């Protein structure tokens, strides 16, 4: 379905002097406590769901205008994706928000009604990126609404049509005192960062993410950073090469490769490297029978600056282009391109491409592949592994990443119910599904001590009485089942607890079954003796 012709308002920067009032209103709304009401949150989420439906044509037209993103991807990866995310939050919010009773307590504290209340953090700032300008702004908003927070949203100025379409949608359908959109560039972002927030959610580059984190640290503001990295793909000789090529090709053409989780390079066993490259060419032809440039499905690079950044990588590489290579600045078009390299110093290996280009680096062994990947970027946002089970398990064991995908290209980050996040310098924190709710929630431990219990709490009051402490310790302190060398020891106490059925699998039910067997065995033995007599 093609994006409809829709008029989108010209990009309008929020006046700097208006920003403090916008933030103050959001804080005042949170302070009114109305967002803590679960029904209020559900109403806002339902309104957002239908707003996405009603503004779908506008949002898809904006995506076409900003990224030349086709209707298929706009619907599948942006608008419809967020609608499903909304429904998941709506359908599960009561469960997510339910107070948890704590049960793993010493018996002496079991009457104190320990529980964990899920409380909203407060007023949050959501700063979005340009690559998925709808999904990666509104998915965090779904979590913030579900958690009971108010939010100020700062979309990317690099996708101005999407920013204006979202501003109109959000401020016309949601509670304007609770949710607002601030548009602009660096000055407006700086002004927002001068405000006090209860959490900041940022999706974008590591360079800007570090600036956000440093500024947030000045006021001890927690942040969730979704960044990126030089993500590796591993292809061993035991992999299904045709499948690996097809799925990795998809990972580099979706949104023209402007995906933070897409692979930057492929470490392929040198014995199958040529075959893998041939399968890449077949996959390319299958996806673009008339060439990538003529395809209505392939997006374009967001702007000339990023086009030239990617072009520079291809211009300066010492490697061999084995697929693609065509570029057209007038259209911001870069053909899906694979470059065969033999040096870690090659520009293709030194920078995150964030586009439809990637390098292929042949390796002798999986040992070498893992060594290279850990050297290039120890904590990437994603890794993709194609091989047999022992190989993929080893890759998971010996390399850290925000997420990982076996036999596919970053699909671990495509499902709205599954936590998504980075690790190390590829990001902090996670969101989506329940993780989105948790991301904007404070888990508040509450205890409630009955007034009548004071007679049993003499142990904590001065003057202290050692005999009372020893008595308490006998009731509350558990004994270790291991010695000083860390070896588990099964002494007499273990066997006593085993036969009583406590602390073992099955618990009381297991104990009853064991004792029934013992008793039945006893009576059967007695019966047999009586028969023989």
Curated annotation (Swiss-Prot):
Cross-referenced SUPFAM superfamilies: ALDH-like
Q: Where is the active site?
A: 226, 260
Spell out the CDD domains in the cross-references. ALDH_F14-YMR110C (cd07135)
Keyword set, alphabetical order: Carotenoid biosynthesis, NAD, Oxidoreductase
Tell me the Gene Ontology biological-process terms attached to this UniProt entry: aldehyde metabolic process; carotenoid biosynthetic process
Going by the entry's taxonomy, the superkingdom of the source organism is recorded as Eukaryota
The protein's GO terms of the molecular function aspect are: aldehyde dehydrogenase (NAD+) activity
* GO annotations of cellular component type: cytoplasm
Induction is noted as: Is not regulated by light unlike the genes responsible for the preceding reactions in the carotenoid pathway.
Question: Using the chain's own numbering, where are the disulfide bonds?
Answer: none
Chemical reaction(s) catalysed: 4'-apo-beta-carotenal + NAD(+) + H2O = neurosporaxanthin + NADH + 2 H(+)
The broad enzyme category this protein falls into is oxidoreductase
Q: Which Pfam family is one of those matched by this entry?
A: Aldedh
What EC number(s) would the UniProt record show?
A: 1.2.1.82
Regions that span the bilayer: none
Q: Kindly indicate whether the keyword Electron transport belongs to this entry.
A: no
Tell me where the signal peptide lies. none
Concerning InterPro entries, the annotation shows: Ald_DH/histidinol_DH, Ald_DH_C, Ald_DH_N, Aldehyde_DH_dom, Aldehyde_DH_NAD(P)
Give a short account of what the protein does: Beta-apo-4'-carotenal oxygenase involved in the last step of synthesis of neurosporaxanthin, a carboxylic apocarotenoid acting as an essential protective pigment and leading to orange pigmentation. Converts the aldehyde beta-apo-4'-carotenal into neurosporaxanthin. Neurosporaxanthin is synthesized from geranyl-geranyl pyrophosphate (GGPP) through several enzymatic activities. Phytoene synthase activity performed by the bifunctional enzyme al-2 first produces phytoene from geranyl-geranyl pyrophosphate (GGPP).
Give the family, as the similarity comment puts it: Belongs to the aldehyde dehydrogenase family.
In its UniProt entry, what is this protein called? Beta-apo-4'-carotenal oxygenase
